[in-house]
């Protein structure tokens, strides 16, 4: 009997790597468990076959029964959902396919507001998992750019702070294409890591103190909110509420990946040089430092601002140098996105990450950030909209409009990712082979003609041979073209898929707050709160609404710029591609005289 395995986490195949896209909960047939390098070969129920990471599946008993099918399956599934890894790789799901990326753990399936009636529990406000997978391509030129800044601080010492010595940061792709002789950078895909901050995991918001401790009621019903030192202003601009943008903007160049080691060379890691353009002073960070930053930003701003996950630590199916470049490219895109946000980029924790001067300053800032109390829904207490109060009906309408748009865009992005993946496969697989076949057939025909012994056909035979070689050249062009145009379009869509995956939780919190206000009439009737308390609740939910509208205006502004740029680039490269092919065909044609 064939061995069966249950998929524990969503996994998305990289184009051209002979991998198989699988969805959490899916049962696959193991066709070759001994591939090696942390991989096995499996086949899904559609007959599609490919490589799957061994850490992503659980081998089922010989009777084929799923050990998770008994007991409280709903509760089991809910628990697993809270730990499910969200992918950030090149092929994603369409809205209609559960076998593509995201199909088995769609954050939109449970974004509706929690049911009213339980004022004693704040679990409903923090139980949803955050959206993940933010990857967007930045300029490929950054791959090879080095900045020789001798003053670059090398990051916190790994031997002085135990919490920075955890093994989960030592990177190495578990791809079977890695050489066995490579020095040990801890292998294996880390989806099962228990650390809540691991970037490849979907993080339950109630695991963070900011989402569990300061509940929504604390924000809505507090008699008087403490006056925070930090203020986040919201103004009304030409397109509605908006964040206040800083007078000068900056980016951060991620470059110069270098291998470091610890424990006398027994463990190795990659660290990257970060150079903010506004200071031009470099600092070095390892991946787990980025992971720490992501966790702190999620804890602090995740109720109001979508904070997409870091690119996956593992980029599968790649040799080490290419893997490092790909991860650096995606870290660059993530940092650029954070630098472009007027609230995140100006936050103390983000500035600390980029501008610390020595190890002492780093550790002081790190611990201060971890003790920050203005996290979770309490971030709204720092916001001051310079706008009139909103009534509850308008607040609800604005929330519904955001939910409707982001859900529709999520579906559209997934569809484009699916189509793009299929096109990539055609361009790197069957299509070049067809051109190669035409080329070889033409050259074979020329060889046959040459064997005739007839003296007057040399020019024709040479022309046919060159035409055949032209088609072989076209085959190579077709196979390489996706890297020049489709790659950038796919990366942009992956980044937005990550952003859109964050909105169900944000919208869920807003809808829940609206429900709390609706329930407040009962509390007023029973004298548990005063009418003035209810008005305070409406005002504070209005502040949340202004924050949501400001964030959406920022989102739309970036969306218009990004998609205009990336689709323009795609079309420019396509035009150049077809013009190159046309020129080669013209040259081949010129060898055939008109008779």
From Swiss-Prot:
GO terms for molecular function: 1-phosphatidylinositol binding; Arp2/3 complex binding; phosphatidylinositol binding; protein homodimerization activity; ubiquitin protein ligase binding. Homodimer, and homooligomer. Heterodimer with SNX18. Interacts with ITCH. Interacts (via SH3 domain) with TNK2, WASL and ACTR3. Identified in a complex with TNK2 and clathrin heavy chains. Identified in a complex with the AP-2 complex, clathrin and DNM2. Interacts (via SH3 domain) with DNM1 and DNM2. Identified in an oligomeric complex containing DNM1 and SNX9. Interacts with FCHSD1. Interacts with ADAM9 and ADAM15 cytoplasmic tails. Involved in endocytosis and intracellular vesicle trafficking, both during interphase and at the end of mitosis. Required for efficient progress through mitosis and cytokinesis. Required for normal formation of the cleavage furrow at the end of mitosis. Plays a role in endocytosis via clathrin-coated pits, but also clathrin-independent, actin-dependent fluid-phase endocytosis. Plays a role in macropinocytosis. Promotes internalization of TNFR. Promotes degradation of EGFR after EGF signaling. Stimulates the GTPase activity of DNM1. Promotes DNM1 oligomerization. Residues 129-144 have a biased composition (Polar residues). It comes from the Eukaryota. Residues 159-169 have a biased composition (Acidic residues). Residues 89-199 are annotated as: Disordered. The modification Phosphoserine is found at residues 121, 200. Phosphorylated on tyrosine residues by TNK2. Phosphorylation promotes its activity in the degradation of EGFR. Residues 1-62 form the SH3 domain. Residues 201-213 are annotated as: Critical for tubulation activity. Belongs to the sorting nexin family. The modification N6-acetyllysine is found at residue 288. This is Sorting nexin-9. PANTHER family: SORTING NEXIN (PTHR45827), SORTING NEXIN-9 (PTHR45827:SF2). The PX domain mediates interaction with membranes enriched in phosphatidylinositol phosphate. Has high affinity for phosphatidylinositol 4,5-bisphosphate, but can also bind to membranes enriched in other phosphatidylinositol phosphates. InterPro entries: AH/BAR_dom_sf (IPR027267), PX_dom (IPR001683), PX_dom_sf (IPR036871), SH3-like_dom_sf (IPR036028), SH3_domain (IPR001452), SNX9_BAR (IPR037425), Snx9_fam (IPR014536), SNX9_PX (IPR037426). One of its GO terms (cellular component) is cytoplasmic vesicle membrane. The gene is Snx9. The modification Phosphotyrosine is found at residue 239. It is found in: Cytoplasmic vesicle membrane; Cell membrane; Cytoplasmic vesicle, Clathrin-coated vesicle; Golgi apparatus, trans-Golgi network. It is a peripheral membrane protein.
């Amino acid at each position: 009997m064939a061995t069966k395995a249950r998929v524990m986490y969503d996994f998305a195949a990289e184009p051209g790597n002979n991998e198989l896209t699988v969805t959490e909960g899916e049962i696959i047939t193991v066709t070759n468990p001994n591939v090696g390098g942390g991989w096995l070969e499996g086949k899904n129920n559609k007959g599609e076959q490919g490589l799957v990471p061994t850490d992503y599946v659980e081998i089922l008993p010989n009777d084929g029964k799923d050990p998770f099918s008994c007991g409280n399956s709903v509760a089991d599934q809910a628990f697993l959902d809270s730990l499910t890894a969200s992918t950030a790789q090149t092929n994603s799901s369409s809205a209609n396919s559960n076998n593509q990326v995201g199909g088995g753990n769609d954050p939109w399936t449970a974004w509706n507001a929690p049911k009213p009636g339980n004022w004693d529990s704040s679990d409903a406000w923090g139980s949803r998992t955050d959206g993940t997978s933010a990857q967007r391509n930045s300029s490929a030129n950054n791959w090879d750019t080095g900045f020789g800044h001798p003053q670059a601080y090398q990051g916190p010492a790994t031997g002085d702070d135990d919490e920075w010595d955890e093994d989960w940061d030592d990177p190495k792709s578990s791809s079977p294409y890695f050489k066995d002789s490579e020095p040990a950078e801890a292998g294996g895909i880390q989806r099962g890591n228990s650390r809540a901050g691991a970037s490849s995991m979907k993080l339950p918001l109630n695991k963070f103190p900011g989402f569990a401790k300061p509940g929504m009621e604390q924000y809505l019903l507090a008699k008087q909110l403490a006056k925070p030192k930090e203020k986040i202003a919201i103004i009304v601009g030409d397109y509605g509420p908006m964040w206040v943008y800083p007078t000068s903007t900056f980016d951060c160049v991620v470059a110069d990946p270098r291998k470091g080691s610890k424990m006398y060379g027994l463990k190795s890691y990659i660290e990257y040089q970060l150079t903010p353009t506004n200071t031009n002073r470099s600092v070095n960070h390892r991946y787990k430092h980025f992971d720490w930053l992501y966790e702190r930003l999620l804890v602090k701003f995740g109720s109001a601002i979508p904070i997409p996950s870091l690119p996956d630590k593992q980029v599968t199916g790649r040799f080490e140098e290419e893997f490092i470049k790909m991860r650096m490219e995606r870290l660059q895109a993530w940092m650029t996105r954070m630098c472009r946000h007027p609230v995140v980029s100006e936050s103390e924790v983000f500035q600390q990450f980029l501008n610390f001067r020595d190890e002492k300053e780093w550790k002081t800032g790190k611990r201060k950030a971890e003790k920050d109390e203005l996290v979770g829904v309490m971030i709204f207490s720092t916001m001051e909209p310079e706008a009139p109060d909103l009534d509850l009906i308008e607040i609800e309408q604005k929330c519904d409009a955001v939910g409707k748009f982001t859900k529709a865009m999520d579906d559209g992005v997934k569809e484009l990712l699916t189509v793009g993946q299929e096109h990539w496969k055609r361009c790197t697989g069957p299509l070049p082979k067809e051109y190669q076949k035409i080329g070889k057939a033409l050259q074979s025909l020329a060889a046959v003609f040459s064997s005739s012994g007839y003296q007057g056909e040399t020019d024709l035979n040479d022309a046919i041979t060159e035409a055949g070689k032209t088609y072989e050249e076209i085959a190579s062009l077709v196979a390489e073209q996706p890297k020049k145009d489709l790659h950038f379009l796919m990366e942009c869509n992956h980044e937005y898929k990550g952003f859109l995956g964050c909105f169900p939780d944000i919208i869920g919190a807003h809808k829940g707050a609206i429900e709390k206000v609706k329930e407040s009439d009962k509390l007023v009737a029973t004298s548990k709160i005063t009418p003035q308390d209810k008005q305070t609740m409406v005002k504070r939910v209005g502040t949340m609404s202004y924050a949501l509208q400001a964030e959406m205006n920022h989102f739309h502004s970036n969306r218009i710029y990004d998609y205009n740029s990336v689709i323009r680039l795609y079309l420019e490269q396509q035009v150049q591609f077809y013009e190159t092919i046309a020129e080669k065909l013209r040259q081949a044609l010129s060898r055939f005289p008109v008779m």
